[in-house]
Amino acid sequence: MAAKNIKYNEEARKKIHKGVKTLAEAVKVTLGPKGRHVVIDKSFGSPQVTKDGVTVAKEIELEDKHENMGAQMVKEVASKTADKAGDGTTTATVLAEAIYSEGLRNVTAGANPMDLKRGIDKAVKVVVDELKKISKPVQHHKEIAQVATISANNDSEIGNLIAEAMEKVGKNGSITVEEAKGFETVLDVVEGMNFNRGYLSSYFSTNPETQECVLEDALILIYDKKISGIKDFLPVLQQVAESGRPLLIIAEEIEGEALATLVVNRLRAGFRVCAVKAPGFGDRRKAMLEDIAILTGGQLVSEELGMKLENTTLAMLGKAKKVIVTKEDTTIVEGLGNKPDIQARCDNIKKQIEDSTSDYDKEKLQERLAKLSGGVAVIRVGAATEIEMKEKKDRVDDAQHATIAAVEEGILPGGGTALVRCIPTLEAFLPMLANEDEAIGTRIILKALTAPLKQIASNAGKEGAIICQQVLARSANEGYDALRDAYTDMIDAGILDPTKVTRSALESAASIAGLLLTTEALIADIPEEKSSSAPAMPSAGMDY
């Protein structure tokens, strides 16, 4: 076991503080509409230019092991906030540094760290309750666009695209961000249930030019096993042919005699039919087939449930207004399923998302929910250079997460105003604390609440303390618009922050800063000295 280097008490806290400060200084320059960029060197490829707090934080690793511990703990603040709300990472870092710096001053002066932490926790609870009171729900397309615009560093093009995407796919829909091949940033929306399985034979296409198979008012057979023989398959085919409606077949595999029969009937008899493989694999495949069955009002024909293919009736088939199948994917538009059943299925998937601990599972469940409830929107980000495109993509990601957070918990006046508006409530709470050190902990939060506003003003070239005094002297929603250097009603001006983002930033910052304040010793490996001697040269007479 390697020898350890241990720091105690004051020395330990100073090392942590230096690490916290080093990381925070790099991150907080990005805050606000006049925040600057940070350029990150990469071991290969071009440097990365970003204004995203968590991206900057993740790149920081300090040489001194004890200082690095402080930096890594604050990095955790940014990561936790990103995980919870998807945005607000820079605000969280600014708050964490403010809470720890002020707390450290009081611990050095003799305050009890455990009581300080209790006071900090109580104060945070009061502030969070107040934020929830002043929060207002997002009601209009315009407000969604404003939230996205602010989060995308005042880029209204991105804000409007995200608002349009949200409007088209709904709050449960999926919005994904991809890199475009051209200069333009565009929005593509796929409405209805879409999965990446195309037709099994090009003979199924109904349009030779587009190579698409379009089935109007279609019936859908959903089967979870292979179909290879025609005998079991014939009864249901005859019923569909008699009904005169087109048929989409989704099965694990359709091959041999069965596929040949379908192709022959399509070409010679004009039977409008298309066969595709079931999406997904294993248990996920079965779940997706059940989703399709519920969406289309049909039944999954499964031998596990005692059903046989030869006994399938028209009543067991799903129905949809339109089905579009290309060689790569299938889209079911306007499935005619029972609305309460679809809603119950969505609620069940939401519950699974909440209970899941795997990020991969959550992502796949979210995809299923989006396909069932609204659709999928893809924002393709374009720019003149790859570096600019990556920077823009970061901003689109932030804006997308901020928008989802706003829809979930509502909005607050932005620009650090909401936190400043909680100061009177926290001041009223102070006399209720009997313990002096707990009261000091609450005062630490009181002071920290002004830190984001001061930093936004500082990044805009103004004196933070003066701006803060001016905002405190004004009424509820009035704050400082750093972009225009004016005091204005933040809600009317469209400068909004999602409640979830502000709440998560404060909670994460207070949690980690509280832990750092109660730290009394640091243990780190002693770095091994690297040998600078050159390797021995082989002697001249050696054989090779």
From Swiss-Prot:
GO BP terms in the entry: positive regulation of non-canonical NF-kappaB signal transduction; protein refolding; regulation of entry of bacterium into host cell
Keywords: ATP-binding, Chaperone, Cytoplasm, Isomerase, Nucleotide-binding, Stress response
EC number: 5.6.1.7
Enzyme class: isomerase
Molecular function in Gene Ontology: ATP binding; ATP-dependent protein folding chaperone; isomerase activity; unfolded protein binding
Catalytic activity: ATP + H2O + a folded polypeptide = ADP + phosphate + an unfolded polypeptide
Residues annotated as transmembrane: none
GO cellular component terms given for this protein: cell surface; cytoplasm; symbiont-containing vacuole
Induction comment: By stress.
Gene3D superfamilies: GroEL, GroEL-like equatorial domain, TCP-1-like chaperonin intermediate domain
Annotated localization: Cytoplasm
Residues reported in the UniProt entry to bind ATP: 30-33, 51, 87-91, 415, 481-483, 497
Self-association and partners: Forms a cylinder of 14 subunits composed of two heptameric rings stacked back-to-back. Interacts with the co-chaperonin GroES.
Reported function: Together with its co-chaperonin GroES, plays an essential role in assisting protein folding. The GroEL-GroES system forms a nano-cage that allows encapsulation of the non-native substrate proteins and provides a physical environment optimized to promote and accelerate protein folding.
UniProt record similarity statement: Belongs to the chaperonin (HSP60) family.
Protein name stated in the entry: Chaperonin GroEL 1
Organism the protein comes from: Chlamydia pneumoniae
